[in-house]
Curated annotation (Swiss-Prot):
Zn(2+) 1 binds at residues 70, 72, 85, 88. Binds 1 Mg(2+) ion per subunit. Its cofactor is Mg(2+); Zn(2+). It comes from Cupriavidus metallidurans (strain ATCC 43123 / DSM 2839 / NBRC 102507 / CH34) (Ralstonia metallidurans). Mg(2+) binds at residues 461, 463, 465. The RNAP catalytic core consists of 2 alpha, 1 beta, 1 beta' and 1 omega subunit. When a sigma factor is associated with the core the holoenzyme is formed, which can initiate transcription. CDD domains: RNAP_beta'_C, RNAP_beta'_N. This is DNA-directed RNA polymerase subunit beta'. Its EC number is 2.7.7.6. One of its GO terms (cellular component) is DNA-directed RNA polymerase complex. Belongs to the RNA polymerase beta' chain family. It catalyses: RNA(n) + a ribonucleoside 5'-triphosphate = RNA(n+1) + diphosphate. Gene3D superfamilies: 1.10.132.30, 1.10.150.390, 1.10.1790.20, 1.10.40.90, 2.40.40.20, 2.40.50.100, RNA polymerase II, clamp domain (4.10.860.120), RNA polymerase Rpb1, domain 3 (1.10.274.100).
Length: 1413
């Protein structure tokens, strides 16, 4: 009976668990896992092929080879289950226990675990407070370590060489002190550590010491010791006395044909360990000489090292073929390791793959599945059906039936796949639209048919792409596939909320051709009663598609919505001036859209907008139907259009010859100048490249103008210009294929080409493809083409790696609640650069939730309440009432711990509604940023010479009409001529409209002359300010007489004569070129008033001192009277070095990795007044005195551009030395919001340049993850260590606990971690280990005895549970609630029993089972 019960017990559900703990195993634990000791290195008997007894594959230890059969064959069959054969000692059970039973090896001498020794920082070193080098010398028998000094002056854990040891023994006598070698010595040291006492000591020393280095060292050691104390792990367990042996099925020995065996490398490594161990045992029994034993112990240590992590120390052990053996560590790490190969990426059954072809007749939610493929994929379903229908009695019979492919099987297949969606996936799956569900339609042939509109989402084309098909098996899976993944439910890109089902190429061309209008087309001016009349006229060739006609068109307007939210429509008939094509197309327009959306030429962008409008106004279902109809019409009409390409369509502009000869003449001129030494070679090259670049643009412009328009005769007989019907122009203009740049190469000139190293070849290709290239031109062209291919390969790899890092850092960010109740947010404005609105306010706030009321600026009434999700209609309203700043919620300020709340995230862009709880917004953000990565460039842009000179502006003018306003940072003085001279470094001028809304903003540089006043009303085109673009002035802010200091000709300044004008100026000499004595002198000028007293800065005791920088041209004389706003000196900016600007993918990676740029800008640490201190060698000392009078010093390299001057008041976080900003500084000085602005804007700049749209919130989500750790500043009464880095949520939890007890909470500073670092420092060690640096992560986690709470998605995928996102979140929540309820019930029962004083029953057989965690 018991056996029967056991049978039922085996199919138990696996235990539920909520966390996984990792730790060090004690020797007892290892022995408890083991089923026996492996004593021999033998594997299997070469004659019988049976495992050797006590060997590495021993059946007695690890279990039988065949199910329910012992080795010698005495016991066979199920009835003997559990019997242990008395002859061969094998237990009769399932053979699969050989996958789970472990053995062990009793080591004759203890050995150190290499991970805790060599994985930096060395954990052994930290615990023992010894250096790694010393420990290694002891372990590998090169030195002794003192364990017990006894009465001798030696110190504990002192290292001595063998000669020293012998000498000391002679000196103090044998046995006076104890010193040992090898792992035994280290083990004894570890045993002797009193952790409690050590911790007290370190804490005391931490309080006492002041040195940074010591604090760091102590804190590290304290952390490790406290971890040991907390986790109950003993330090001596880092030394192995027993070595576990992996189950044999996990390191198999496979017979190959030809009598040889393929074996796992682990067997070789284990064999080595066993051999050396046995030899050592024998030597110890024989009492061999110490030196031989030592050598054997060292070899054993090395063998164990190799088994655990081959190659970590010394040379890697190699097999017979000189290849390093694959150790246990290599099994789990890297791309092919256990984590990434088998746990995160599994192969799936019920899947197939095939080539895709276009399926133009499919509906959007369908795909064509080849019959044979479907038959194979749905086999089990067919078997089931055959059995239930009684056609086959057994599975075997059903199999036969299916293989013979009888008609009944095909009927059943049709039935089985009806309403059963399949999932199609195209690799690489870069975002969630890379895998979508479709309803299969059975087709003949062997290729999968794909709907043309989903190609954009899959990034698929039909040039031989393959796709994989997966079958969702369970009912839940089918339901999720249908509701969440069906192609018709995924019509928007999650990255930006634009429609993903936009037609392209031939469809666009067909729609564009149909909706173009033509002057004097056949039948122009006719009027039609309705659309059917138009169609009749068109089919009888009375009118052509593009003719302008008048038609009565019926539009349907929404009257009201009924109770279900379905709209009611009322027809409205109007006579519209339109074209034949547009009116025919209007038949497919969904109800509720006005005809005006179609009444224009439909280019690709217009079609996208049209589908977007349909989605917002008519809903998903109508949009999908409309898109399908558009597709059909487009295909049909494209064939009607008859657009083709001929060589005559490529019109070469007649001006081309002249433009090229002019350019060549200019180039000759520069060559002459270079020959006569007027310009350098670099300048000549820059100018030549510039000239040819401009020439190419001119040719291109001339060509486009010629292509764009054609002359036609209208009805009155006059000649007028109309947009051209040139085929090539129409293809480019409609957005179907090709671009102006490509047409330029066909009919203009190819232009400048780059060498493989990125530099531009100065002779351009003046020919185009129509004229043909000569051999040289062709050769130059091949350079560029080849570089393009090489770049693409690099780019794909880099982009994939960026995506992987992004996913890893955000994978655990899930929407876990609807509202966190925060009142924080960020104020959004339109993004303006150089006076142009780059991104309008409406685009930035669409789909966000307001955090403050939006107030109408005119009436001061609340227009939109707090907590409203801004949809299209509300943003229109905000635009209309003229609000220019809206405060919205953002993922950065969300107060939810371990996740995000829906309100802070806002709209789910892929669905168009407020985000649902359980949405994995982190992964979506990572995919949205990573997916377009392959479109970004890999190159760094060289800017220099001519290219940047052309871009230097010297004035700024208003683009809009309105009122000028200056920002608070704008400071200016009025000079004697009455001009306003700017003396602030960060002043900006805004132009506001009548409502006071900001229309544009312009930076006004220092020294510029303002041409407008604050509050002045101006017209568009008014100049606001002018300045000299080539020099930077130093302007006097006060009036007085100059008094030079340290301005000595030949010492600090040199006289420079201008050859042309004959005037002389003084130039400040670089300090490096001066003599030693004069190096510290700073040329500067002070001002004297009428009484010859130094002019003071108002309100202080500082004299006005104006320093001259290196290279400054001093324009005033000593003793000269100067007035406010007068220029004292000029610094030429011409000497700006050509600097590389990192662009494209590397720039994005740099921002997300939070790398500090080299030559970063220096920001003011405090608000205060600037002064200059005494200079040191090569550095200038800048002092900021804050409001309390404390001085903060900065040392700045002399060649750096200092942006501030003596006496200037700077605000905290203001830039004082020029350079690229360091994100860490921004965070420290300006806070999280500024940092977020900086990263978002910089990342967006890169993507915008490539024309890629990504919503800001995705970048904010990543920044939130980069900021999730904080550094403890003041510990308070918490358990933290000062300077420790912890998760923000952990700190908040701990602070809540402390505050609840009425104690002092800890304070913290924000930390910015790069995405790699943030991924590795996550709380989940499983997630971190599967990302990078597996060994280090696991070593650290084991010592800390870490517990992984399985919060993120990755950890759950790895342990094989449902992920806590989407439906999984609900599942886990329900499970936890159920468990809590059960616990409460159990508690209640036990309480009741207590109260009744009933002795609980003794027998509790069923209670204890299934409770294991």
């Amino acid at each position: 009976m018991k056996a029967l019960l056991d049978l039922f017990k085996q199919v138990q559900q696996e235990e539920q668990f909520d966390a996984i703990k990792i730790g060090l195993a004690s020797p007892e634990k290892i022995r408890s896992w083991s089923y026996g000791e492996v004593k021999k290195p033998e594997t299997i008997n070469y004659r019988t092929f049976k495992p050797e007894r006590d060997g590495l594959f021993c059946a007695k230890i690890f279990g039988p080879i065949k199910d329910y059969e012992c080795l010698c064959g005495k016991y066979k069959r199920l009835k003997h289950r559990g019997v242990i054969c008395e002859k061969c000692g094998v237990e009769v059970t399932l053979a699969k226990v050989r996958r789970e039973r472990m053995g062990h090896i009793e080591l004759a001498a203890p050995t150190a675990h290499i991970w805790f020794l060599k994985s930096l920082p060395s954990r052994l070193g930290m615990v023992l407070d010894m250096t790694l080098r010393d420990i290694e010398r002891v372990l590998y028998f090169e030195a002794f370590v003192v364990l017990e000094p006894g009465m001798t002056p030696l110190k504990k854990s002192q290292i001595m060489s063998e000669d020293d040891y012998i000498a000391k023994c002679d000196e103090y006598g044998e046995g006076e002190f104890v010193a040992m070698m090898g792992a035994e010595g280290i083990r004894e040291l570890l045993r002797g550590i009193d952790i409690e006492k050590q911790i007290e000591q370190i804490r005391a020393e931490l309080q006492a010491t002041g040195s940074e280095a010591k604090i760091k060292k102590f804190a590290k050691r304290l952390k490790v010791l406290e971890a040991f104390q907390r986790s109950g792990i003993k330090p001596e367990w880092m030394i192995l006395e027993v070595l576990p042996v992996l189950p044999p099925e996990l390191r198999p020995l496979v017979p190959l044909d030809g009598g040889r065996f393929a074996t796992s490398d682990l067997n070789d490594l284990y064999r080595r360990v066993i051999n050396r161990n046995n030899r050592l045992k024998r030597l110890l029994e024989l009492k061999a000489p110490e030196i031989i034993v030592r050598n054997e112990k060292r070899m054993l240590q090395e063998a164990v090292d190799s088994l655990l992590d081959n190659g970590r120390r010394g040379k890697a052990m190699t097999g017979a073929n000189k290849r390093p053996l694959k150790s246990l560590a290599e099994m789990i790490k890297g791309k092919g390791g256990r984590f990434r190969q088998n746990l995160l990426g599994k192969r799936v059954d019920y899947s197939g793959r095939s080539v895709i072809v276009v399926g133009p007749t499919l509906k959007l939610h369908q795909c064509g599945l080849p019959k044979l493929m479907a038959l194979e994929l749905f086999k089990p379903f067919i078997f089931h059906k055959l059995e239930t229908m009684g056609i086959a009695t057994t599975i075997k019979a059903a199999k036969k039936e299916v293989e013979s492919q009888t008609p009944v099987v095909w009927d059943i297949l049709e039935e089985v796949i009806r309403e059963h969606p399949v999932m199609l996936n195209r690799a690489p799956t870069l975002h969630r639209l890379g895998i979508q569900a479709f309803e299969p339609v059975l087709i003949e042939g062997k290729a999968i048919q794909l709907h043309p509109l989903v190609c954009a989402a899959f990034n698929a084309d039909f040039d031989g792409d393959q796709m994989a098909v997966h079958v969702p098996l369970s009912l839940e899976a089918q339901m999720e596939a249908r509701t969440l993944m069906l192609a018709s439910n995924n019509v928007l890109f999650p990255a930006n909320g634009d429609p993903s089902i936009v037609p392209s190429q031939d469809v666009v061309l067909g729609l564009y051709y149909t909706t173009r209008d033509k002057i004097n087309g056949k039948g122009e001016g006719m009027t039609f009663a309705d659309i059917s009349e138009v169609i009749r006229a068109y089919e009888n060739k009375e009118v052509e598609l593009a003719s302008r006609v008048n038609v009565r068109i019926t539009e349907y307007e929404v009257v009201n919505k009924d109770a279900d939210g379905d709209a009611r429509f009322a027809p409205k008939i109007t006579l519209q001036a339109t074209t034949v094509g547009r009116s025919i197309l209007s038949e497919i327009l969904p109800k509720g859209l006005p005809f005006s959306v179609l009444n224009k030429p439909l280019k690709k962008k217009e079609i996208s907008r049209l589908i977007n409008t349909a989605f917002r106004k008519c809903g998903l279902r109508e949009t999908v139907i409309f898109a399908d109809k558009l597709l059909q019409s487009g295909f049909r009409l494209a064939t009607r259009a008859g657009i083709s390409i001929a060589i005559d369509d490529m019109l070469v502009p007649p001006q081309k010859e002249k433009i090229i000869s002019d350019a060549a003449a200019k180039v000759k001129e520069y060559d002459k100048q270079y020959m006569s030494g007027l310009v350098t070679d670099q300048e000549r090259y820059n100018n030549v490249v510039d000239i040819w670049g401009a020439a190419g643009d001119q040719v291109g412009k001339a060509m486009m103008e010629q292509l764009q328009h054609e002359d036609v005769v209208d009805r009155t007989g006059a000649t007028v210009k109309q947009e051209s019907f040139n085929s090539i122009y129409m293809m480019a203009d409609s957005g179907a294929r090709g671009s102006a740049a490509q047409i330029r190469q066909l009919a203009g000139m190819r232009g400048l080409m780059a060498k493989p190293d990125g530099s531009i070849i100065e002779t351009p290709i003046t020919a185009n493809f129509r004229e043909g290239l000569n051999v040289l031109q062709y050769f130059i062209s091949t350079h560029g083409a080849r570089k393009g291919l090489a770049d693409t390969a690099l780019k794909t790899a880099n982009s994939g790696y960026l995506t992987r890092r992004l996913v890893d850092v955000t994978q655990d960010l899930v929407v876990v609640e609807d509202d966190c109740g925060t009142s924080n947010g960020v104020a959004m404005k339109a993004l303006v650069e150089g006076g142009e609105v780059i991104e309008a306010l409406r685009d930035r706030i669409l789909g966000r939730v307001t955090v403050a009321d939006v107030v109408n600026p005119e009436t001061q009434e609340t227009a939109i309440e707090t907590g409203t999700l801004l949809d299209e209609d509300l943003v229109e309203l905000i635009d209309a009432i003229g609000v220019d700043e809206v405060k919205v919620r953002t993922p950065l300020s969300c107060d939810t711990r371990y996740g995000l709340c829906g309100k802070c995230y806002g709209r789910d862009l892929g669905r168009g509604v407020l985000v649902n709880s359980g949405e994995a917004v982190g992964v979506i953000a990572a995919q949205s940023i990573g997916e377009p990565g392959t479109q970004l460039t890999m190159r760094t842009f060289h800017i220099g010479g001519a290219a940047s000179r052309a871009a230097v502006a010297s004035s700024v003018e208003a683009k809009a009409t309105g009122t000028v306003r200056f920002t608070a940072t704008m400071r200016y003085v009025t000079n004697t001529k009455g001009e306003l001279i700017v003396i602030s470094r960060s002043g900006e001028a805004l132009i506001t409209d009548d409502h006071g809304r900001e229309r544009e903003r312009h930076k006004i540089p220092y020294g510029a002359t303002l041409l407008v006043q604050d509050g002045q009303a101006i017209k568009a085109g008014t100049q606001l300010a002018t300045w000299d673009a080539l020099t930077r002035p130093i302007v006097s802010e006060y009036t007085g007489t100059t008094k030079f200091e340290n301005v000595e000709e030949g010492v600090t300044v040199a006289k420079q004569m201008d050859e042309v004008t004959g005037l002389s100026t003084l130039v400040v000499i670089d300090a490096k070129r001066r003599t030693a004595a004069t190096k510290g002198l700073r040329p500067q000028v002070k001002l004297l008033d009428a009484n010859n007293q130094e002019v003071k800065i108002p309100g202080t005791d500082h004299s006005v001192t104006i320093g001259f920088q290196v290279g400054a041209l001093i324009t005033v004389k000593d003793g000269q009277q100067v007035h406010v706003g007068e220029v004292l000196a000029r610094i030429p900016t011409e000497s700006q070095k050509t600097r590389d600007i990192t662009g494209g993918l590397p720039r994005v990676a740099e921002l997300f990795e939070a790398r500090s740029p080299k030559d970063a800008a220096v920001l003011a640490e405090v608000t205060g007044t600037v002064s200059f201190g005494k200079d040191t060698k090569g550095k200038q000392r800048l002092v900021i005195t804050d409001l309390d009078g404390n001085a903060h010093e900065f040392l700045i390299a002399k060649e750096k551009q200092v942006l501030v001057h003596d006496g200037q008041v700077v605000n905290k976080g203001e830039m004082i030395v020029e350079g690229p900003a360091d994100p860490h500084d921004i965070l420290r000085l300006k806070g999280i919001e500024e940092l977020a602005h900086y990263i978002v804007d910089e990342v967006q700049d890169v993507y915008r340049l490539q024309g890629v749209k990504i919503n800001d919130k995705h970048i904010e989500v990543i920044v939130r993850q980069m900021l999730r750790r904080v550094q403890i500043a003041d510990v308070g009464d918490t358990k933290f260590i000062p300077g420790e880095q912890v998760e923000r949520s952990e700190l908040l939890d701990e602070n809540d606990r402390v505050i609840a007890d009425g104690k002092r909470p800890a304070t913290h500073e924000n930390l910015l971690l790069g995405i790699t670092k943030a991924s590795l420092s996550t709380d989940s060690f499983i997630s971190a280990a599967s990302f990078q640096e597996t060994t280090r992560v696991l070593t650290e986690a084991a010592i800390m005895g870490k517990t992984d709470d399985l919060r993120g998605l990755k950890e759950n995928v790895i342990v094989g549970r449902l992920i806590p996102a989407g439906t999984g979140l609900a599942y886990h929540r329900a499970r936890k609630a159920r468990e809590a309820a059960e616990r409460e019930r159990a508690q209640a029962i036990s309480d009741e029993e207590q109260s009744l004083f009933i002795e609980p029953p003794v027998v509790q057989a069923t209670e204890g089972e299934g409770d294991a965690v």
